[in-house]
């Protein structure tokens, strides 16, 4: 019963009609069904009233006071569901809000839509502070609801001791009766609230009041199997001799419950002297009025039959094991209820503190899906149980046939007069008992043997079932371990992070190399195009060629991209053969995740080529070799598994590396080899491994991916796994069919042997009769000897057939196990198919996302290339501008000289050559040129050696003279160039910022996807843990159900055997009465004692079974206090059906 968990609703503790319909058959339930809500539709219910209701829900007393004062709201106004803020405060225990509403003049006697007022709700949900406030506000303490219950009835049903004390302190009526005639003491006794019963009795409640069916509190306490409550009621003056309307007293209810301690208490109370007057405790006016009402109720209900006599012998228990077990169960129930309440309060606090997150909804959906899966598994297990029952029925038929055959043999033994197994059988035979007495004694012996054998068979079946359950749980654990390889994922993630770090270091080294090479490229402007072409030639194909658009340069590397898929398949086969041959290196020597080898005709050549290429890689490319060693070490750490598992790991590793390397942006250089940096492929095409002189290119080799490869081996591996599973399932089914055919053939052979044995037994019986007839006339010792020898031979044959039947039972058990294993294999196959489908979908989704990311990365790379080319052009323009700016000081000097000359000439030619306005304009331009020249001089100082070289050129050009118009033209051109350069620089800055933002966005999306994946893994782990918990709970429930079913079957069988034994004992007694007195030997007395012991054992077993059912029934009564979910209702309904079936069997 540990799986029965009562889940309470904090909002309303009221049973639904389905729960009330599943109550035990003990009469009408003491908890009244609430009246139907009228749903009073208030016409003026508005948003302000809803705000008031929400404030009470949040226990916000200042807001409640403000709303009532400002808006003039009425707290007792009912909403469309029939509840108000005033009643909600009493139900939730919001004492401060209730005090505010009472202070504003609320009607404390108003009822809600169900007919409850605030006093009833506060007592029902156990809020003594609210009760005290309402009673101090002149609320009537004994007001009844629509079912006739007072506040004390509700407090007694809920078991709230403090609420009952408050009501008693305000002089509440202690013995009010509801419509069914139940008093608070009767309800508290039925709910087994011992402390509450003690309080009511101390306050003066009538202990012997009866309801309309004539039941007292003592009867209901006995029915609930609560010895503590019975003891308190007996100490309070309860009389055990009172009978109900059916004439049953408390001892009858105690006998039905099967509690020995209760029967002992009742017996002690019956032995004590009764009080002189039964009405001494009813002297007060209240008690007399209640007794008069009880008497009227008893007169109105006619008695149908007299009370049956109490049990003839009430057992006196030597120990209190049963009582201690019940006390322990009650304490455990209290702890569980307290824990459930604490968890619910914690959950409500968390809901109030923060709203539910989306992950919680996802987890709830996963839990619901797991519960649905659990229900499906339960249905499959029930179908297995039905098949097991059918096999057990077949076995029972075989056992019946075997018993019939053994019965024929025993009758033959009885007719001959041999009793070899019982003590004193030879003495009885020598004294020549009558045939009827011998027959009865032999039948008793056979019954004892059958009972012993059945007990042994039941123990063997229980052992088989336990072994089957252990195997099932072990297979489930192994299946879970095969489905989700988390260690593989962690190792691949570590390798992916390491490759990403290496890629980042290579990019950083490349940038540093580019910054060091910038001055070299500025040395010769005419050779820039040649250097760029040489760099492109050395670095191999471009990024577009890496993504699959093949250029003629890709064929130089030794493997065309057209043959990528075929080469990938051959690589996988080579890795598989290499792993089978060596067993140490699982995935071969992979430099990166996407590596395509040259196409070879055989697998051996592929292995040799990979070995050669690995050695060349280790010699020529240290960075790639380091990556290879890291990956090989990471794969070898996981261990060498099966070939298919290795292939899947290799594919997943390649996929992970490809996805990881596709994210970072690529610099201006491209990869040297698109199909894997291998030295052998380079030598085959005439390209030397040492021909690459650019160290920046070598640094980028391990970080550049080979484009989008979708790994066709994953689908092939999944198909192979599915085909293998289907072949295994077919093989299991074929083996099961073969076993079934063999078992059927063996059963037919056993049936034929049984028929032959029956025919032989008939012949022997006829021969025995003939021998008896001949013995009666003249008798012959030789025939008797032959008959005995034939009987011995028949016994041997029957023993052989018995052993054969046992072998058949073992074979049937093996068949059951095989069928169960087949079903488990089918379940595993279905789970694996679903898992493969999910993995395939996830892989396709990830491949689509990877394609999108790669396209985005390709566009980003193209944009980056364009920006780099634009930056190179801008750099060249900047160099030209700097060169021109370096020429400005000489031009400025010349301008100064020209200005001086112009000043001199202006004095002479002021009227004829240059006007005054033009002179002022030239002076202003000269001033601007001076400021600009000063800034340019500062830049010239920073340039260093190049400025000195340019000054030398300027010195050579100073010899030439420049005219004024030429000077103005040069100045205008320089100004336009400077403005154009500034605009280009601003545009370049904007593009750089945009590119940086896009790169940052891509990185952030990658990190977000990583965090989401980790969260999904954590959620999957929690869901798996919850699934394991649900599976264990379902297994426990199934075990409890199977134990209860076995106990019920045993009880039925024992009842039948008891009836048969009683009949046989009766016949034996009759036969013994017919015998002379001299036959009463000690052996017969010993047999009688054995018969009595067997009967007593069977009676004790029946009583134990009835006590178990009564214990389940008491737990059902305890669960009435809370809301039961569907699982608990189903389990309790099964228990009730078992009890009804037992009653029908009796």
Curated annotation (Swiss-Prot):
Q: Which gene encodes it?
A: ANKRD24
Q: Which domain of life is it from?
A: Eukaryota
Where is this gene product found? Cell membrane; Cell projection, Stereocilium
- GO molecular function annotation: actin binding
Any stretches that span the bilayer, and where are they?
A: none
Q: Which organism is it from?
A: Homo sapiens (Human)
Q: Coiled coil where?
A: 320-517, 714-1110
Q: Give a yes or no for keyword Repeat in this entry.
A: yes
The answer to keyword Transit peptide applying to this record is no
State what protein this is by name: Ankyrin repeat domain-containing protein 24
Q: Which PANTHER family match?
A: ANKYCORBIN
Region ranges (Disordered): 272-320, 607-627, 766-785
Q: What is its main location?
A: membrane
